[in-house]
């Protein structure tokens, strides 16, 4: 394992004779090499709101947490034989939620001890069958868990399941998000619908469809229309705006109050985005993946423009964005000497200039 801490310049290639690309809006501040234990697959990543802690979850049940500024070895803990489907830091950064999958899904809450390398399990809760996603509210008091056919709302102080919202989607859930104020929930189903909910009354407020392929150009003769669904969804902190990215890489944004479409961007070369790579900033902009999966870009929904936030040399496999979208961390992978190795990049967004 190697940790590099410091502000690094993002390098973006441009063709001969072309104007230099716009300066990225984020700086890469930390790189951690070879984050996985021997032979383990990394499926999820979490980044604390202040960027001081980064965690990965492995398919063998192991969780690893770094505090890059300390320069110490990572804390390694977890439950064997429970693949880590998702991780999430509470807004305070001193509570980590993990979702383990083995037959039934198990939510676990962890806290650091006196030593940065000592994390202890506070509590656990069985949440149901085929559960894959976690999302804290803005206060860290509620935690939403996405399962195949429902979303479970958990009171973190228990932890206790205080509500179960049964999905109205025709097929299984593919993505979800909980607004920071916990007053809106968004879900996506494999059939191509995206629904915004009032989680208190368990009532659907708006349903949008992303099922139609938006990829530019004509399909080759004889090929059927592709199935399209949202693989990422997000709500603005106050729940007034919603966004989605489809399996084709098309980006959508809507006004939740009126139900109107704010933005749609389809690109012929875009592909399915990395997991976790969508979040609204506190001022209403949208942080989303680049079309080539090698970075992130920031959408101004008023001007309907986007600017490069950061880019690297490898495709992002999975991304974690802080609750305020002020930073993000990405997992990349490569084969080195016949073994699969995962690295982590941590980026911080620079203050908006108003341009």
Residue positions per predicted region:
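WD40-repeat beta-propeller superdomains and closely related acidic/aromatic-rich repeat-like regions
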Residues: 16-355
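Bacterial N-terminal signal peptides
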Residues: 4-14
């Amino acid at each position: 394992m190697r940790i590099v801490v410091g502000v690094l310049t993002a390098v973006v290639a441009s063709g001969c004779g072309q104007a230099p690309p716009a300066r990225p809006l984020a700086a890469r501040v930390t790189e951690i090499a070879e984050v996985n234990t021997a032979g383990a697959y990394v499926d999820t990543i979490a980044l604390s709101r202040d960027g001081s802690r980064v965690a990965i979850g492995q398919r063998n049940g192991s969780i690893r947490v770094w505090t890059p500024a300390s320069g110490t070895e990572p804390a390694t803990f977890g439950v064997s034989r429970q693949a880590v489907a998702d991780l999430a830091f509470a807004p305070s950064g001193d509570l980590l939620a993990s979702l383990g999958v083995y037959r039934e899904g198990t939510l676990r809450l962890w806290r650091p001890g006196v030593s940065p390398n000592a994390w202890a399990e506070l509590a656990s809760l069985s949440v149901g069958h085929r559960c894959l996603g976690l999302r804290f509210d803005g206060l860290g008091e509620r935690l939403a868990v996405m399962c195949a056919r429902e979303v479970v709302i958990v009171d973190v102080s228990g932890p206790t399941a205080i509500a179960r919202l049964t999905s109205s989607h025709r097929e299984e859930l593919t993505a979800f998000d909980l607004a920071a104020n916990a007053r809106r929930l968004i879900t996506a189903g494999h059939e191509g619908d995206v629904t915004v909910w009032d989680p208190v009354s368990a009532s659907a407020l708006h349903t949008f469809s992303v099922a139609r392929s938006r990829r530019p150009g004509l399909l080759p003769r004889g090929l059927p229309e592709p199935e399209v669904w949202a693989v990422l969804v997000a709500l603005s902190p106050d729940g007034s705006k919603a966004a989605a990215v489809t399996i084709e890489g098309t980006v959508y944004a809507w006004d939740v109050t009126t139900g109107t479409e704010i933005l749609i961007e389809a690109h012929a070369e875009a592909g399915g985005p990395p997991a976790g790579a969508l979040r609204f900033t506190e001022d209403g902009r949208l942080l989303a993946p680049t079309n080539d999966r090698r970075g992130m870009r920031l959408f101004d929904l008023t001007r309907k423009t986007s600017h490069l936030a950061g880019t690297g040399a490898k495709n992002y496999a999975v991304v974690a964005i802080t609750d305020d979208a002020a930073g993000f961390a990405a997992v990349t992978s490569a084969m080195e000497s016949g073994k699969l190795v995962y690295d982590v990049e941590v980026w911080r967004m620079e203050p908006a200039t108003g341009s």
